[in-house]
């Protein structure tokens, strides 16, 4: 089970990752909540603390939103930012011969609960677009094979990956051994 802080953190982290995947800089967020009446004030305060903690880390300003009553917890997070036209990276930009790179180890997020507190790769993405000729990027939150397929399809290219070169998290090792 996720804590309120983790839920808040992850809700903003997903939007920040989308900005990072295009080479952008996140600036603002709008947070809208549908809150069941059964939730405590403490839960909601901790939810906002999770959002604010990540917003502070990346200098993102919460500029608005809405709060309503609902039967279930509903969160809608919109992140706004900017990217210089020459640094904009789309999933449709891959070219034959491009090298496929990732910025961290894969797998094990469920076991380690890392998926609840991951840090968006905004700094890494900006470093890449500022220092290298990058043709395409994507947030691989849906998994390497699924998201690599999105790039290949949208760019009309193929892809070849070498399993032995994929960095696998220690938390993922042995999961499928059973």
Predicted regions and their residues:
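Active-site cofactor/substrate anionic-group-binding motifs, chiefly glycine-
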Residues: 1-22
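Short pre-catalytic strand/loop immediately N-terminal to key active-site residues, enriched for Gly-Thr
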Residues: 2-7, 114-118, 135-136
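Glycine-rich anion-binding loops of enzyme active sites
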Residues: 25-110
């Amino acid at each position: 089970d996720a804590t309120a802080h983790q839920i808040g953190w992850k809700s903003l982290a997903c939007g920040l990752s989308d900005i990072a995947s295009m080479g952008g800089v996140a600036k603002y967020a709008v947070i809208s909540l549908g809150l069941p009446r059964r939730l405590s004030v403490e839960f909601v305060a901790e939810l906002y603390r999770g959002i604010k903690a990540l917003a502070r880390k990346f200098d993102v300003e919460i500029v608005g939103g809405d709060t309503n009553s609902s039967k279930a917890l509903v969160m809608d997070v919109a992140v706004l930012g900017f990217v210089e036209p020459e640094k904009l990276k789309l999933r449709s930009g891959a070219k034959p011969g491009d090298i496929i790179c990732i910025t961290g180890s894969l797998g094990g997020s469920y076991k380690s609960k890392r998926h609840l507190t991951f840090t968006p790769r905004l700094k890494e993405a900006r470093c890449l677009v500022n220092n290298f000729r990058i043709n395409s990027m994507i947030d691989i939150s849906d998994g390497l094979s699924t998201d690599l397929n999105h790039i290949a399809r949208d760019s009309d290219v193929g892809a070849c990956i070498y399993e032995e070169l994929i960095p696998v998290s220690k938390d993922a090792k042995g999961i499928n051994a059973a």
